[in-house]
Amino acid sequence: MTDIAPTAPANLAWPDHFAVAHMPGSLPMGGVVPMTPIFAFREPAPRLALPRDHGLTPQRTDIELGGLIAFLISDVITQGEADAIVEASERFGYRDEAPGIQTPPGMRMNKAVHWVADEQTLGPIFDRIAHLLPHDMDGAQLYPALSRRINMYRYDAEDVFNPHTDGDWPGYGLTPDRRQMQEWAGLRSCFSMLLYLNGPEDGVQGGSTRLFRPDRGHEDVMPKKGSALFFRHGFGPRSVLHEGSRVFGEVSKYVARINVMYNFG
């Protein structure tokens, strides 16, 4: 993928960051850390200010899953934008526990950090792909913004996220004074958006996302830097069972889960 649109200079300073919320965080092999932080920058980060038009043409490819909904959108962000998001996440710091996530022992075997992004980051991303998203789900209308809460995962060597389904979530953003995370009223998510921030072109080995059909067949999606995989989630039969397959080698895989919101109010 060619980095067409100009990106903020890599030498721009990062703002300070701090915890805007704490939630119980589940550990990979069981147990809970009661006060697991969710982070934000104290002010918008210039390196995460994305242009509305990034010079690329996102394209949607539907994935056949026996009636379940899943699709891939290419060229969502540029290489430079992906690198900046990874760098931001490393500044917050990855940890074993994942806030607000409940998984049984041995299911989620990776590192996590959750943070709340600004409109200047996720607003342009939504604008680039909105025309490719389902605009009506079960009578609810697509909300014109992605949830600002980003759940990021780093897969080091031998890390895996064993088969699971994603629950639906409320949307989140920051309060006007940026001091706290705030839940959005009347909204629920219908799709997980897995934004791939690196891939085989960066030396990642393994790490495909395996999507299961109802007949237990499957489709494997290899991470491609800048592309995003979407699939239906929630607590019902239409939620897509999936797996973050094992990563091998010295290069870690980075992925961001972002929730696509619908207005049920």
Model-assigned labels for residue ranges:
Residues M1-F230, G234-G265:
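Fe(II)/2-oxoglutarate oxygenase catalytic core
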